[in-house]
């Protein structure tokens, strides 16, 4: 228990060290996720990002990512549920890993394309089903294209195959989303996860897919704050009839 608390505490302490904002037209690096959906974004070589998601049921998930080479990044993550609140903390079974490779940069006509693997899901972890409330992307391919329209407007698409399959749903999955800048420091993000891999067998979804919306604000000198609304279509079979509210925090800073 003490080791797990120390591991998570390292992420929190590191937050005061890292810097570089990501919302609005003045953003200095690429978004790697909209809310839960991977994009084709990748960490710049020599930069490191520390992020934290705070979700219902006392869930806290922290991640650190590093741009190792041009077009290659690596990250680790960890968290649990009931971290905020009282009672016993339910730690995730294993840390998550995140690897990305940029296979094609964006051009005037073509989107950027990134291949990757991410084993980190979000929300509570269900040991009997060996899955997270929000399944991890697993293996994924993501494409992203930017347009100039009253600032910047970005569109994103993704195909993924998760390794969380004990619930009986082993399908490939698709998702798409957008990011729209509002001035120099604010962005609005949205995504739709078809959840083809979360609607049959013992899956937690009802077949509506997951519609999520959020906002990102570059507070200054690297600090990015975000607000997320998840499951606006009321797709989950449990605790339904309302969207989940969450907070997102991220810092980026050159480290080598």
List where the protein language model places each region.
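Positively charged n-region of N-terminal signal peptides that target proteins for export
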Residues: 1-4
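Transmembrane beta-barrel domains of Gram-negative outer membranes and organellar outer membranes
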Residues: 20-155, 159-164, 179-256
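N-terminal signal peptide c-region/cleavage motif recognized by signal peptidases
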Residues: 14-19
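A contiguous pocket-lining binding segment that forms or flanks enzyme active sites
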Residues: 173-178
């Amino acid at each position: 228990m003490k080791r797990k608390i120390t591991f998570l505490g390292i992420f929190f302490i590191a937050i005061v060290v890292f810097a570089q904002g990501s919302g609005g037209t003045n953003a200095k690096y690429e978004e790697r996720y909209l809310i839960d959906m991977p994009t084709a974004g990748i960490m710049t070589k020599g930069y490191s990002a520390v992020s934290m998601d705070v979700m219902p049921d006392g869930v806290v998930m922290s991640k650190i990512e590093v741009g190792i080479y041009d077009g290659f990044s690596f990250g680790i993550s960890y968290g649990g549920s009931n971290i905020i609140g009282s009672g016993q903390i339910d730690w995730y079974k294993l840390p998550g890993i995140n690897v990305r490779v940029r296979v094609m940069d964006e051009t005037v006509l073509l989107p950027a394309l990134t291949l990757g693997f991410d084993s980190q899901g979000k929300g509570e972890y269900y040991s009997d089903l060996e899955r997270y409330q929000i399944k991890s992307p697993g293996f994924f391919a993501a494409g992203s294209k930017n347009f100039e329209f009253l600032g910047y407007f970005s569109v994103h698409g993704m195909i993924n195959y998760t390794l969380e399959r004990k619930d009986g749903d082993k399908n490939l999955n698709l998702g798409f989303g957008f990011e729209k800048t509002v001035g120099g420091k604010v962005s609005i993000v949205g995504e739709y996860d078809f959840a083809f891999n979360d609607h049959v067998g013992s899956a937690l979804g009802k077949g509506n897919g997951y519609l999520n919306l959020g906002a990102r604000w570059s507070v200054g000198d690297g600090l990015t704050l975000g607000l997320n609304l998840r499951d606006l279509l009321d797709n989950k079979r449990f605790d339904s009839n309302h969207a989940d509210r969450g907070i997102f925090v991220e810092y980026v800073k050159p480290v080598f």
